[in-house]
Amino acid sequence: MSQRTVVIASRVGLHARPASLFAQAVAASGAQVTIGKPGEPSIDASSILMVMALGIGHGEEVVLESEDDGVLDQLVTLLETDLDAE
């Protein structure tokens, strides 16, 4: 299992629109991906409600895990983008 640590760039964190775009990208990838705060349990990253429930704010770190390195790289790029600005 590979993992990546990324800092959330969206101004409101992973809430509403950014969480939706992220969860949709995970689901579309077809890969099993988890997300969580460092040192805390991870959840299914394809669930928008679970992602929003993490309460991840702007500038916070999250850890992504998956068997698919390519998907992880794409998701890191997505989270490093201010999804509220698009």
Regions found by a protein language model. Name each.
Residues 1-5, 61:
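Intrinsic-disorder/low-complexity, polar/charged segments enriched in Ser/Thr/Lys/Arg/Asp/Glu/Gln
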Residues 4-7, 66:
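Long, low-complexity, intrinsically disordered polar/charged segments
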Residues 7-56:
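Compact, glycine-rich, soluble single-domain proteins
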Residues 52-86:
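C-terminal structural segments of small proteins and small subunits
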